[in-house]
Regions:
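N-terminal low-complexity or simple alpha-helical regulatory segments
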Residues: 1-94
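Structural motif
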Residues: 15-23, 111-118, 248-252
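Short, hydrophobic/amphipathic alpha-helical patches that form generic packing surfaces
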Residues: 24-32, 120-128, 259
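Short acidic (Asp/Glu) and glycine-rich catalytic loops that position anionic groups and cofactors
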Residues: 34-36, 134, 167, 234-239
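Short acidic, hydrophobic short linear motifs in intrinsically disordered regions
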Residues: 36-42, 136-138, 268-270
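Short helix-coil junctions and helix-kink-helix linkers
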Residues: 43-45, 142-146, 275-280
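DNA-contacting interfaces and partner/effector-binding or oligomerization modules
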Residues: 52, 56-201
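Extended mid-to-C-terminal alpha-helical interaction segments
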Residues: 190-287
Length: 287
């Protein structure tokens, strides 16, 4: 399964013990699902865990069943639908929405007075319209709805809860998203996916360690290249002196250093300085 599927599977382990939280979660699902109108509700998902949760969620929150559910053997996109006027009226009544009014969807904050209800709403929104990228590849979590006011008001709710989502429009959809690993960790923890949040944290630690190792390797490689280049230049000079019969005419310490370099072409200046008798400093041998 993908990381996003694993997150949704973890979220679906919530027990649905509190009615108000079930209503809030159902509210999030409806505002972020495929179709939510006064005549039809349609929810399409590829998450089998979410598909297994939906009938229990709607029974707990609204006391209703779906008119259409996927068959047990169905694969791919799983579809749920409600077209019954009575059932839709029951949902609207529970959510304190006017069935006969012109329906411009927005978030009724009166339904989300407690923190647990806010988190349940966000959990439902993510289950219906959210996704998160494998943190080993990159950091990106988003929630998508076709309803502009819903997205703007959900953004306000997230900000009130201490998050800083970014917004964009794409293909007629309104998207809230996070690209910072710490925001993704905190969001997943808040809506009930603590194990997945730890997965994001572990991926970040691994990336930081790997980047640190790469930086050190690059630095050491660059230093080694400098040592090799310097050594090759010194070896060429020593050979030229030797061929000209000038090597033995060098002053004692310089001659000793040249002979050590000829015998130890891969040694650093610091290592050569330590080989001299008596040893001298790196700066002295460089001079």
């Amino acid at each position: 399964m993908s990381f996003s599927s694993n997150v949704k599977a973890e979220l679906c382990k919530d027990s649905l013990s509190k009615k108000s939280c079930a209503v809030a979660e159902g509210y999030g699902v409806l505002l972020y699902c495929n179709t939510f109108s006064s005549t039809e509700i349609r929810i399409i998902t590829e998450s089998r865990d979410f598909a297994a949760r939906l009938p229990r969620l709607f029974k707990k929150a609204f006391g209703i069943t779906f008119d259409q559910e996927p068959a047990a053997q169905d694969r791919g996109k799983l579809q749920f639908a409600i077209s019954s006027e009575d059932k839709i009226a029951k949902i609207f009544e529970t959510l304190q929405m006017d069935l006969k009014a012109s329906l411009t969807l927005h978030v009724n904050f009166g339904m989300l007075e407690e923190e647990a209800e806010c988190m349940a709403y966000l959990r439902g929104a993510f289950l219906a319209g959210g996704s998160v990228t494998d943190p080993a590849k990159r950091y990106h979590l988003e929630m998508t709805t076709s309803h502009y006011k819903v997205s703007r008001e959900t953004c306000a709710l997230l900000i009130e809860c201490g998050f800083s989502p970014k917004e964009l429009s794409r293909g007629g959809n309104n998207i809230l998203y996070f690209k910072q690993s710490d925001y993704i960790e905190d969001f997943l923890t808040a809506i009930g996916a603590q194990v997945s949040a730890m997965g994001v944290m572990e991926a970040k630690v691994e990336k930081d360690l790997r980047n640190g190792v790469n930086r050190r390797v690059n630095c050491e490689t660059a230093n080694l290249t400098k040592v090799v280049d310097a050594s090759m230049g010194q070896m060429a000079a020593i050979r030229a002196l030797e061929e000209a019969g000038e090597l033995d005419k060098l002053p004692g310490k310089l001659r000793e250093t040249a002979l050590l370099r000829r015998e130890n072409p891969e040694a650093t200046l610091q290592e050569l300085a330590a080989m001299l008798n008596p040893p001298i400093t790196k700066s002295a041998i460089n001079h």
